[in-house]
């Protein structure tokens, strides 16, 4: 399979898909491999046509989308492919991840992939940076020889094994990918022979090229978008420039057809649209018994026991826990003891070379580990205030899942919760820096069929939510949950009704004009119950 961080390069992918016959039915019907079909593809891509309902009027998009055969991520935000590629393939699978040199400036989470990759539970992951030396408005640091050489040294310090090659030559890509795969296999062999230990030197391709290579404006800011100085349809000079540079890229039809037929003649390989990463459909998880009770405790203890039991009941599903640092503080000590931090050199019984807990003080990196683990079971827990830093990565996955559903090919990955705890009602001691409700409020604006926002009040109401969360496909849940000890508000039956209906009347009294007291979450419910008593005393 493939992953591309630069989603706006989708035009090249769509063109290759057409040439190789790697298309979904809606594209195959509209874009045949002939002059008319190719012309229609080019015209549609720049038409920005809209249907009556506001959706795109053609099966194309500005970025990788569910109509793009083999596409698994939009690539709308630079930097997230870098954080996800090592966690995407399962054992026996192979993934090539095309990355951006501009995204290398985004953050350092991408440096840690050798720390997380394990041959025992990960497939082959081959990152390739397209080092074209430019972002949108200016040259990148990697656009200089000194910057590129410094980046190679940086990669080595992070545990990568950099391999530079000519990014202007398609054959060089093939050779480089083969070489990278051989190097990784050799390192795994040395690991098995106890010559090496984790982290293994992870091959990292650097395709040195020029932005806009082969066309007018190459190597300049103009290469980002439409490099011609004017529209060739209306301006003679622009038309001459277009014809001059397009002529150098033109391939004679018979030669192009022969090359396409050669690709089509290869047997025994699935089309990219049918690769396992694009068709994730893990088995429905076996549900563990639910341990309801009626005594006061941290609501998080329900999740702590449930997730450990769920993982044990489903050894065929790879677990990942995203942890920005305080798993034990957030009352998930059982999860930590059972699954342990993934490290290279364990220093306690809570750490293991093969741990399933991805821990880093980088919220985007740890949530990306779970967003990428689409063939397994996932859990992310963080202080509510720090969840805000996950929002962009989460929205990218939600948008793609919603588009998959609209295209008639819904996502098959199993749902899981993003837990916002140590929340605003609990964090007064840390003042406003730790009191931020942005995350759940923003997710309330997402479509309900791909995101639920849930505010359970106690152990039982949180526990009753979990089976459906983990059985639903292509849908995440934001759980805002207290971590301190809280009373048991609900019986088993009430908790299950609340999980099913979304709201529950807990008390009613008095006559006359009703006064509604509405609570969301544990602390509000306590205060509303106190308020109800006092209002009743006043005859309200």
Locate each region found by the language model.
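Glycine-rich ThDP/TPP pyrophosphate-binding loop and its adjacent helix/strand module
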Residues: 61-257, 431, 435-540
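Non-catalytic terminal/interface segments that mediate subunit docking, oligomerization
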Residues: 21-25, 260-412, 473-475, 485, ...
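Flexible, small-/acidic-enriched active-site or ligand-binding loops
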Residues: 57, 400-403, 433-438
């Amino acid at each position: 399979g493939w992953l591309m961080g630069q989603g706006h390069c989708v035009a090249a992918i769509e063109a290759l898909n057409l040439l190789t016959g790697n298309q979904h039915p809606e594209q195959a019907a509209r874009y045949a491999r002939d002059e008319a079909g190719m012309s229609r593809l080019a015209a549609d891509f720049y038409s920005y046509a809209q249907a009556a309902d506001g959706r795109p009027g053609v099966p194309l998009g500005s970025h990788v989308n569910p109509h793009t055969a083999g596409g698994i991520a939009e690539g709308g935000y630079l930097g997230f492919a870098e954080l996800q590629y090592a966690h995407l393939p399962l054992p026996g699978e192979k993934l090539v991840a095309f990355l951006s040199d501009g995204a290398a400036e985004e953050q350092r989470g991408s440096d840690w992939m050798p720390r997380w990759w394990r041959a025992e539970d990960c497939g082959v992951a081959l990152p390739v940076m397209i080092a074209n030396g430019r972002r949108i408005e200016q040259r990148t640091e990697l656009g200089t020889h000194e910057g590129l050489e410094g980046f190679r040294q940086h990669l080595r310090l992070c545990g990568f094994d950099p391999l530079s090659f000519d990014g202007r030559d398609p054959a060089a890509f093939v050779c480089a990918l083969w070489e990278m795969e051989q190097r990784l296999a050799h390192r795994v062999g040395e690991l098995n022979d106890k010559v090496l230990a984790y982290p293994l030197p992870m091959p990292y391709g650097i395709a040195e090229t020029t932005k806009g290579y082969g066309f007018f404006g190459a190597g300049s800011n103009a290469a980002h978008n439409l490099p011609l100085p004017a529209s060739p349809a209306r301006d003679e000079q622009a038309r001459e420039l277009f014809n001059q540079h397009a002529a150098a890229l033109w391939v004679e039809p018979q030669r192009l057809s022969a090359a396409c037929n050669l690709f089509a003649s290869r047997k025994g390989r699935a089309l990219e649209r049918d690769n396992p990463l694009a068709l994730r459909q893990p088995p429905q998880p076996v549900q563990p018994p639910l341990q309801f009770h009626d005594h006061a405790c941290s609501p998080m203890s329900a999740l702590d026991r449930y997730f450990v039991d769920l993982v044990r009941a489903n050894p065929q599903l790879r677990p990942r826990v995203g942890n920005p640092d305080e798993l034990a503080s957030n009352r998930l000590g059982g999860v930590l003891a059972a699954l342990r931090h993934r490290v290279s050199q364990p220093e306690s019984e809570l750490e293991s070379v093969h741990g399933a807990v991805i821990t880093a003080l980088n919220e985007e990196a740890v949530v990306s580990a779970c967003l990428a683990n689409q063939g397994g079971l996932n859990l992310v827990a963080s202080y509510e205030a720090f969840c805000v830093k996950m929002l962009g990565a989460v929205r990218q996955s939600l948008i793609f899942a919603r588009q998959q559903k609209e295209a008639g090919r819904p996502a098959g990955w199993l749902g899981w919760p993003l837990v916002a705890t140590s929340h605003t009602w609990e964090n007064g001691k840390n003042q406003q820096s730790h009191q931020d409700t942005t995350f759940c409020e923003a997710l309330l604006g997402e479509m309900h069929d791909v995101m639920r926002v849930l505010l359970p009040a106690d152990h039982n109401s949180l526990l009753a939510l979990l089976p459906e969360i983990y059985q639903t496909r292509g849908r995440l849940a934001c759980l805002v949950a207290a971590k301190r000890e809280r009373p048991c508000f609900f019986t088993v039956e009430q908790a299950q009704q609340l999980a099913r209906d979304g709201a529950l009347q807990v008390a009613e009294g008095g006559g006359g004009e009703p006064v509604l007291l509405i609570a969301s979450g544990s602390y509000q419910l306590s205060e509303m119950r106190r308020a109800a008593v006092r209002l009743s005393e006043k005859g309200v």
